[in-house]
Protein backbone atom coordinates (compact mmCIF):
# COMPACT_ATOMS: atom_id res chain seq x y z
CA UNK A 1 0.00 0.00 0.00
CA UNK A 2 0.96 3.66 -0.14
CA UNK A 3 3.80 4.80 2.09
CA UNK A 4 2.80 7.58 4.46
CA UNK A 5 5.10 10.60 4.71
CA UNK A 6 6.30 11.46 8.19
CA UNK A 7 5.33 14.76 9.75
CA UNK A 8 8.95 15.85 9.69
CA UNK A 9 9.14 15.65 5.91
CA UNK A 10 5.82 17.18 4.89
CA UNK A 11 3.75 20.15 5.97
CA UNK A 12 0.16 20.76 4.92
CA UNK A 13 -0.39 24.12 3.26
CA UNK A 14 -3.64 24.41 1.29
CA UNK A 15 -5.64 22.91 -1.53
CA UNK A 16 -4.38 23.59 -5.03
CA UNK A 17 -7.05 23.67 -7.74
CA UNK A 18 -5.99 23.15 -11.35
CA UNK A 19 -7.87 23.23 -14.65
CA UNK A 20 -6.39 21.22 -17.52
CA UNK A 21 -7.39 20.18 -21.02
CA UNK A 22 -6.20 17.02 -22.77
CA UNK A 23 -6.36 16.26 -26.50
CA UNK A 24 -7.47 12.69 -27.18
CA UNK A 25 -6.25 10.66 -30.12
CA UNK A 26 -9.60 11.08 -31.91
CA UNK A 27 -9.57 14.87 -31.55
CA UNK A 28 -11.95 15.13 -28.58
CA UNK A 29 -10.71 17.53 -25.91
CA UNK A 30 -11.29 16.48 -22.32
CA UNK A 31 -11.45 19.14 -19.63
CA UNK A 32 -10.47 18.16 -16.12
CA UNK A 33 -10.46 19.69 -12.68
CA UNK A 34 -7.67 18.75 -10.27
CA UNK A 35 -7.42 19.14 -6.51
CA UNK A 36 -4.25 18.36 -4.56
CA UNK A 37 -2.92 19.03 -1.08
CA UNK A 38 -0.19 21.63 -1.44
CA UNK A 39 2.72 20.48 0.71
CA UNK A 40 6.40 21.13 1.28
CA UNK A 41 8.71 18.15 1.46
CA UNK A 42 12.37 17.29 1.36
CA UNK A 43 11.72 13.69 0.33
CA UNK A 44 10.56 12.06 -2.88
CA UNK A 45 6.86 12.92 -3.32
CA UNK A 46 6.15 10.71 -6.32
CA UNK A 47 4.21 8.22 -4.21
CA UNK A 48 0.97 10.16 -4.46
CA UNK A 49 -2.49 8.80 -3.72
CA UNK A 50 -4.56 9.12 -6.89
CA UNK A 51 -8.35 9.50 -7.01
CA UNK A 52 -10.30 9.74 -10.29
CA UNK A 53 -13.90 11.00 -10.15
CA UNK A 54 -16.54 10.35 -12.82
CA UNK A 55 -19.72 12.46 -12.85
CA UNK A 56 -23.31 11.64 -13.71
CA UNK A 57 -25.42 12.22 -16.80
CA UNK A 58 -25.72 15.93 -17.75
CA UNK A 59 -23.63 16.83 -14.69
CA UNK A 60 -19.96 17.77 -14.89
CA UNK A 61 -16.77 17.77 -12.83
CA UNK A 62 -18.06 20.67 -10.71
CA UNK A 63 -20.36 18.19 -8.97
CA UNK A 64 -17.24 17.21 -7.00
CA UNK A 65 -16.41 20.79 -5.95
CA UNK A 66 -17.32 20.03 -2.33
CA UNK A 67 -16.46 16.37 -2.00
CA UNK A 68 -12.92 16.65 -3.38
CA UNK A 69 -11.64 19.31 -0.91
CA UNK A 70 -13.44 17.51 1.92
CA UNK A 71 -11.68 14.26 1.05
CA UNK A 72 -8.32 16.01 0.82
CA UNK A 73 -8.74 17.60 4.22
CA UNK A 74 -9.78 14.43 6.01
CA UNK A 75 -7.36 12.17 4.19
CA UNK A 76 -4.55 14.58 5.08
CA UNK A 77 -5.54 14.14 8.71
CA UNK A 78 -5.08 10.43 8.26
CA UNK A 79 -8.53 9.67 9.65
CA UNK A 80 -12.22 10.30 9.11
CA UNK A 81 -12.13 13.23 11.52
CA UNK A 82 -14.45 16.13 10.79
CA UNK A 83 -12.16 18.60 12.57
CA UNK A 84 -11.74 21.63 10.32
CA UNK A 85 -8.29 22.40 11.72
CA UNK A 86 -5.31 20.94 9.92
CA UNK A 87 -2.62 20.21 12.47
CA UNK A 88 1.05 20.53 11.55
CA UNK A 89 2.23 17.40 13.35
CA UNK A 90 0.28 14.79 11.39
CA UNK A 91 1.27 12.28 8.79
CA UNK A 92 0.30 13.43 5.32
CA UNK A 93 -0.12 11.38 2.17
CA UNK A 94 0.26 13.53 -0.95
CA UNK A 95 -3.06 13.18 -2.74
CA UNK A 96 -4.34 14.27 -6.14
CA UNK A 97 -8.02 14.14 -7.07
CA UNK A 98 -8.99 14.50 -10.73
CA UNK A 99 -12.53 14.88 -12.06
CA UNK A 100 -13.14 14.93 -15.80
CA UNK A 101 -15.93 16.33 -17.92
CA UNK A 102 -17.14 13.51 -20.16
CA UNK A 103 -17.41 14.43 -23.87
CA UNK A 104 -20.39 16.69 -24.43
CA UNK A 105 -20.46 17.70 -20.76
CA UNK A 106 -18.98 20.67 -18.93
CA UNK A 107 -16.03 22.23 -20.75
CA UNK A 108 -15.14 19.15 -22.81
CA UNK A 109 -15.73 19.18 -26.56
CA UNK A 110 -18.61 17.40 -28.26
CA UNK A 111 -18.27 14.23 -30.28
CA UNK A 112 -18.13 14.61 -34.05
CA UNK A 113 -21.21 14.39 -36.26
CA UNK A 114 -20.62 10.69 -36.93
CA UNK A 115 -19.51 9.82 -33.41
CA UNK A 116 -21.80 8.03 -30.93
CA UNK A 117 -22.66 10.76 -28.42
CA UNK A 118 -23.60 8.52 -25.52
CA UNK A 119 -22.35 4.97 -25.11
CA UNK A 120 -21.26 3.82 -21.66
CA UNK A 121 -18.28 1.94 -23.08
CA UNK A 122 -17.26 5.12 -24.96
CA UNK A 123 -17.10 7.00 -21.67
CA UNK A 124 -14.96 4.20 -20.25
CA UNK A 125 -12.65 4.62 -23.23
CA UNK A 126 -12.19 8.35 -22.59
CA UNK A 127 -11.55 7.72 -18.91
CA UNK A 128 -8.91 5.19 -19.95
CA UNK A 129 -7.30 7.69 -22.30
CA UNK A 130 -7.22 10.28 -19.52
CA UNK A 131 -5.51 7.74 -17.26
CA UNK A 132 -2.88 7.32 -19.96
CA UNK A 133 -2.42 11.08 -20.14
CA UNK A 134 -1.99 11.28 -16.38
CA UNK A 135 0.43 8.32 -16.46
CA UNK A 136 -1.61 6.67 -13.74
CA UNK A 137 -2.69 3.08 -13.32
CA UNK A 138 0.65 1.40 -14.13
CA UNK A 139 0.29 2.85 -17.59
CA UNK A 140 3.38 4.28 -19.21
CA UNK A 141 1.70 5.83 -22.24
CA UNK A 142 1.36 9.57 -22.62
CA UNK A 143 -1.10 11.93 -24.29
CA UNK A 144 -0.98 15.53 -25.32
CA UNK A 145 -1.97 18.10 -22.71
CA UNK A 146 -3.27 21.18 -24.51
CA UNK A 147 -3.13 23.71 -21.70
CA UNK A 148 -2.96 23.95 -17.93
CA UNK A 149 -3.69 26.65 -15.39
CA UNK A 150 -3.11 26.44 -11.66
CA UNK A 151 -4.86 28.49 -8.97
CA UNK A 152 -4.36 28.44 -5.21
CA UNK A 153 -7.79 28.49 -3.57
CA UNK A 154 -9.40 31.72 -4.83
CA UNK A 155 -6.17 33.36 -6.00
CA UNK A 156 -6.01 34.63 -9.56
CA UNK A 157 -2.39 33.61 -10.04
CA UNK A 158 -1.99 31.16 -12.91
CA UNK A 159 0.93 29.10 -14.13
CA UNK A 160 1.69 26.37 -16.64
CA UNK A 161 1.50 22.81 -15.32
CA UNK A 162 2.97 19.54 -16.50
CA UNK A 163 1.99 15.92 -16.09
CA UNK A 164 3.68 14.28 -13.09
CA UNK A 165 6.06 11.41 -13.76
CA UNK A 166 4.83 8.88 -11.22
CA UNK A 167 6.78 5.70 -10.64
CA UNK A 168 6.21 2.58 -8.58
CA UNK A 169 3.46 0.09 -9.34
CA UNK A 170 1.62 0.30 -6.03
CA UNK A 171 1.83 4.11 -5.93
CA UNK A 172 0.24 4.31 -9.36
CA UNK A 173 -2.92 2.45 -8.33
CA UNK A 174 -6.08 4.56 -8.57
CA UNK A 175 -9.11 4.91 -6.33
CA UNK A 176 -12.01 5.24 -8.77
CA UNK A 177 -15.08 7.25 -7.69
CA UNK A 178 -18.26 7.34 -9.77
CA UNK A 179 -21.61 9.05 -9.27
CA UNK A 180 -24.82 7.87 -10.96
CA UNK A 181 -23.96 7.28 -14.65
CA UNK A 182 -20.32 7.70 -13.67
CA UNK A 183 -20.74 4.70 -11.36
CA UNK A 184 -21.74 2.59 -14.33
CA UNK A 185 -18.72 3.80 -16.28
CA UNK A 186 -16.53 3.08 -13.26
CA UNK A 187 -17.78 -0.52 -13.00
CA UNK A 188 -17.13 -1.17 -16.71
CA UNK A 189 -13.68 0.44 -16.55
CA UNK A 190 -12.69 -1.39 -13.38
CA UNK A 191 -13.89 -4.72 -14.77
CA UNK A 192 -11.85 -4.18 -17.94
CA UNK A 193 -8.67 -2.85 -16.27
CA UNK A 194 -8.68 -4.11 -12.67
CA UNK A 195 -4.89 -3.86 -12.44
CA UNK A 196 -5.18 -0.07 -12.51
CA UNK A 197 -7.30 0.28 -9.39
CA UNK A 198 -6.90 -0.22 -5.65
CA UNK A 199 -10.50 0.68 -4.76
CA UNK A 200 -13.89 1.48 -6.30
CA UNK A 201 -16.37 3.95 -4.78
CA UNK A 202 -19.92 4.02 -6.19
CA UNK A 203 -22.18 6.91 -5.22
CA UNK A 204 -25.88 6.58 -6.00
CA UNK A 205 -25.47 4.41 -9.02
CA UNK A 206 -24.46 1.29 -10.82
CA UNK A 207 -25.19 -0.24 -14.18
CA UNK A 208 -28.65 0.06 -15.72
CA UNK A 209 -29.92 -3.22 -17.16
CA UNK A 210 -32.59 -3.78 -19.79
CA UNK A 211 -34.26 -6.90 -21.06
CA UNK A 212 -32.64 -8.49 -24.11
CA UNK A 213 -36.15 -8.90 -25.53
CA UNK A 214 -36.42 -5.10 -25.91
CA UNK A 215 -33.25 -4.73 -28.02
CA UNK A 216 -34.86 -4.26 -31.44
CA UNK A 217 -37.50 -1.84 -30.16
CA UNK A 218 -34.80 0.17 -28.42
CA UNK A 219 -32.65 0.41 -31.56
CA UNK A 220 -35.71 1.49 -33.56
CA UNK A 221 -36.47 4.28 -31.08
CA UNK A 222 -32.84 5.46 -31.03
CA UNK A 223 -32.57 5.46 -34.84
CA UNK A 224 -35.81 7.39 -35.27
CA UNK A 225 -34.71 10.06 -32.80
CA UNK A 226 -31.31 10.37 -34.45
CA UNK A 227 -32.76 10.59 -37.97
CA UNK A 228 -35.22 13.27 -36.91
CA UNK A 229 -32.85 15.38 -34.81
CA UNK A 230 -29.72 15.25 -36.97
CA UNK A 231 -31.44 17.32 -39.65
CA UNK A 232 -31.96 20.10 -37.11
CA UNK A 233 -28.59 19.90 -35.39
CA UNK A 234 -26.47 19.53 -38.53
CA UNK A 235 -28.29 21.31 -41.38
CA UNK A 236 -25.06 22.04 -43.28
CA UNK A 237 -23.24 18.78 -42.74
CA UNK A 238 -23.21 17.86 -46.45
CA UNK A 239 -21.44 21.06 -47.49
CA UNK A 240 -18.68 20.49 -44.95
CA UNK A 241 -19.42 23.51 -42.74
CA UNK A 242 -20.96 21.59 -39.85
CA UNK A 243 -18.58 19.26 -38.01
CA UNK A 244 -19.97 19.12 -34.47
CA UNK A 245 -23.18 19.76 -32.61
CA UNK A 246 -24.06 23.42 -32.19
CA UNK A 247 -25.55 25.56 -29.44
CA UNK A 248 -27.05 28.01 -31.94
CA UNK A 249 -30.51 26.54 -31.37
CA UNK A 250 -30.14 26.09 -27.62
CA UNK A 251 -32.70 27.71 -25.35
CA UNK A 252 -31.58 31.14 -24.17
CA UNK A 253 -31.87 32.01 -20.47
CA UNK A 254 -31.97 35.66 -19.45
CA UNK A 255 -29.14 35.23 -16.95
CA UNK A 256 -27.27 32.65 -14.90
CA UNK A 257 -29.91 32.65 -12.16
CA UNK A 258 -32.59 31.68 -14.68
CA UNK A 259 -30.45 28.75 -15.83
CA UNK A 260 -29.92 27.65 -12.22
CA UNK A 261 -33.67 27.80 -11.64
CA UNK A 262 -34.19 25.60 -14.71
CA UNK A 263 -31.68 23.06 -13.37
CA UNK A 264 -33.47 22.95 -10.03
CA UNK A 265 -36.81 22.55 -11.78
CA UNK A 266 -35.46 19.59 -13.75
CA UNK A 267 -34.49 17.84 -10.52
CA UNK A 268 -38.03 18.21 -9.20
CA UNK A 269 -39.31 16.25 -12.20
CA UNK A 270 -36.94 13.34 -11.65
CA UNK A 271 -38.17 10.03 -10.20
CA UNK A 272 -38.63 9.70 -6.46
CA UNK A 273 -38.30 12.51 -3.92
CA UNK A 274 -35.12 14.00 -5.29
CA UNK A 275 -33.91 17.46 -4.35
CA UNK A 276 -30.86 19.52 -5.26
CA UNK A 277 -29.37 22.37 -3.28
CA UNK A 278 -28.98 25.79 -4.86
CA UNK A 279 -25.24 25.66 -4.17
CA UNK A 280 -24.73 22.37 -5.99
CA UNK A 281 -26.90 23.49 -8.90
CA UNK A 282 -24.95 26.72 -9.23
CA UNK A 283 -21.59 24.93 -9.27
CA UNK A 284 -22.67 22.70 -12.15
CA UNK A 285 -24.57 25.37 -14.10
CA UNK A 286 -21.63 27.80 -14.04
CA UNK A 287 -19.52 25.14 -15.73
CA UNK A 288 -22.33 24.01 -18.03
CA UNK A 289 -23.23 27.39 -19.58
CA UNK A 290 -21.70 30.00 -21.85
CA UNK A 291 -22.77 33.49 -22.97
CA UNK A 292 -25.58 33.45 -25.51
CA UNK A 293 -23.93 36.34 -27.34
CA UNK A 294 -20.15 36.35 -27.04
CA UNK A 295 -19.95 39.74 -28.78
CA UNK A 296 -22.14 41.51 -26.21
CA UNK A 297 -20.42 41.72 -22.83
CA UNK A 298 -23.35 43.62 -21.32
CA UNK A 299 -25.82 40.88 -22.11
CA UNK A 300 -26.17 38.39 -19.24
CA UNK A 301 -28.07 35.81 -21.30
CA UNK A 302 -26.63 32.28 -21.26
CA UNK A 303 -27.21 28.92 -22.95
CA UNK A 304 -26.31 25.44 -21.81
CA UNK A 305 -23.23 24.17 -23.62
CA UNK A 306 -23.87 20.42 -23.28
CA UNK A 307 -24.29 18.27 -26.39
CA UNK A 308 -28.06 18.02 -27.00
CA UNK A 309 -27.55 14.49 -28.32
CA UNK A 310 -26.95 13.38 -24.73
CA UNK A 311 -30.72 13.45 -24.29
CA UNK A 312 -31.27 10.92 -27.06
CA UNK A 313 -31.70 7.20 -26.35
CA UNK A 314 -28.40 5.35 -26.59
CA UNK A 315 -28.07 2.94 -29.50
CA UNK A 316 -26.87 0.25 -27.12
CA UNK A 317 -27.55 -0.85 -23.57
CA UNK A 318 -26.47 -3.67 -21.30
CA UNK A 319 -28.61 -6.71 -20.56
CA UNK A 320 -28.98 -8.22 -17.11
CA UNK A 321 -26.50 -10.95 -17.99
CA UNK A 322 -23.89 -8.37 -18.98
CA UNK A 323 -24.47 -6.26 -15.87
CA UNK A 324 -24.03 -9.30 -13.64
CA UNK A 325 -20.85 -10.25 -15.52
CA UNK A 326 -19.31 -6.78 -15.12
CA UNK A 327 -20.00 -6.74 -11.38
CA UNK A 328 -18.76 -10.30 -10.99
CA UNK A 329 -15.55 -9.41 -12.81
CA UNK A 330 -14.93 -6.51 -10.45
CA UNK A 331 -15.44 -8.76 -7.42
CA UNK A 332 -13.23 -11.58 -8.69
CA UNK A 333 -10.50 -9.07 -9.56
CA UNK A 334 -10.26 -8.42 -5.78
CA UNK A 335 -10.72 -4.65 -6.17
CA UNK A 336 -12.61 -3.64 -2.96
CA UNK A 337 -15.84 -1.70 -3.49
CA UNK A 338 -17.65 0.94 -1.44
CA UNK A 339 -21.33 1.41 -2.37
CA UNK A 340 -23.19 4.42 -0.93
CA UNK A 341 -26.83 5.25 -1.67
CA UNK A 342 -29.09 8.11 -0.57
CA UNK A 343 -32.33 7.72 1.36
CA UNK A 344 -34.12 10.08 -1.05
CA UNK A 345 -32.02 9.26 -4.09
CA UNK A 346 -32.78 7.77 -7.48
CA UNK A 347 -35.22 4.86 -7.07
CA UNK A 348 -33.65 1.46 -7.74
CA UNK A 349 -35.40 -1.83 -8.32
CA UNK A 350 -34.97 -4.91 -6.17
CA UNK A 351 -33.09 -6.75 -8.93
CA UNK A 352 -30.25 -4.21 -9.05
CA UNK A 353 -29.97 -4.17 -5.27
CA UNK A 354 -29.71 -7.95 -5.18
CA UNK A 355 -27.07 -8.01 -7.93
CA UNK A 356 -24.99 -5.42 -6.09
CA UNK A 357 -25.09 -7.52 -2.92
CA UNK A 358 -24.64 -10.93 -4.58
CA UNK A 359 -22.30 -10.19 -7.50
CA UNK A 360 -20.42 -7.03 -6.55
CA UNK A 361 -20.37 -7.78 -2.81
CA UNK A 362 -19.19 -4.35 -1.58
CA UNK A 363 -17.03 -4.39 1.54
CA UNK A 364 -18.58 -1.05 2.50
CA UNK A 365 -22.35 -0.78 1.88
CA UNK A 366 -24.40 2.04 3.45
CA UNK A 367 -27.49 4.17 2.88
CA UNK A 368 -27.06 7.79 3.96
CA UNK A 369 -29.45 10.68 4.38
CA UNK A 370 -29.80 13.04 1.45
CA UNK A 371 -30.80 12.99 -2.20
CA UNK A 372 -29.26 11.85 -5.49
CA UNK A 373 -26.54 14.52 -5.36
CA UNK A 374 -25.71 13.94 -1.70
CA UNK A 375 -22.01 14.23 -2.55
CA UNK A 376 -22.54 17.76 -3.94
CA UNK A 377 -25.05 19.22 -1.47
CA UNK A 378 -23.48 21.17 1.44
CA UNK A 379 -25.70 19.55 4.08
CA UNK A 380 -24.82 15.96 3.18
CA UNK A 381 -21.34 15.99 1.63
CA UNK A 382 -19.67 15.66 5.03
CA UNK A 383 -21.32 12.31 5.77
CA UNK A 384 -20.43 11.03 2.29
CA UNK A 385 -16.82 12.13 2.71
CA UNK A 386 -16.52 10.41 6.09
CA UNK A 387 -17.66 7.09 4.62
CA UNK A 388 -15.32 7.38 1.64
CA UNK A 389 -12.39 8.31 3.89
CA UNK A 390 -13.14 5.36 6.18
CA UNK A 391 -13.13 3.06 3.15
CA UNK A 392 -9.85 4.47 1.84
CA UNK A 393 -8.24 4.17 5.26
CA UNK A 394 -9.28 0.51 5.31
CA UNK A 395 -7.46 0.04 2.00
CA UNK A 396 -4.28 1.31 3.63
CA UNK A 397 -4.61 -0.71 6.84
Where are these regions (language model features)?
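Conserved alpha/beta-hydrolase catalytic His-Asp/Glu region
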Residues: 239-320
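Catalytic histidine-centered segment of alpha/beta-hydrolase-like enzymes
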Residues: 371-381
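Conserved serine/cysteine hydrolase catalytic core
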Residues: 290-358
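N-terminal cap/lid segment of alpha/beta-hydrolase-fold proteins
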Residues: 8-29
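Flexible "cap/lid" loop of the alpha/beta hydrolase fold
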Residues: 188-191, 198-255
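Conserved HGGG/HGGXW glycine-rich cap/lid loop of the alpha/beta-hydrolase fold
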Residues: 33, 38-40, 44-110
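Active-site loop/oxyanion-hole signature of alpha/beta-hydrolase fold enzymes
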Residues: 25-26, 33, 38-39, 90-177, ...
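Gly/Ala-rich beta-loop-alpha elbow adjacent to hydrolase catalytic centers
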Residues: 178-182, 186
Amino acid sequence: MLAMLSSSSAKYSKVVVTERTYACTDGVKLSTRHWSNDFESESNLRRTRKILCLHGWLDNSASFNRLAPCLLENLSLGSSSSDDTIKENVDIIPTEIVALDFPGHGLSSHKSVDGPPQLLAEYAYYAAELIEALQWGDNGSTANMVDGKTTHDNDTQQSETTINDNSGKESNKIILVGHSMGSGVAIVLCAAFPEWFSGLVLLEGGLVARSANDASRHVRSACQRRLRSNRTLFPNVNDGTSTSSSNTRAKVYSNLEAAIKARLSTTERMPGDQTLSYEAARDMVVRATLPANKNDNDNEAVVFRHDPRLQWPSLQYYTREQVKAFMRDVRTSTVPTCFLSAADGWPTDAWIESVVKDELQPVHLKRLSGSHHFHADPDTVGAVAREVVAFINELNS
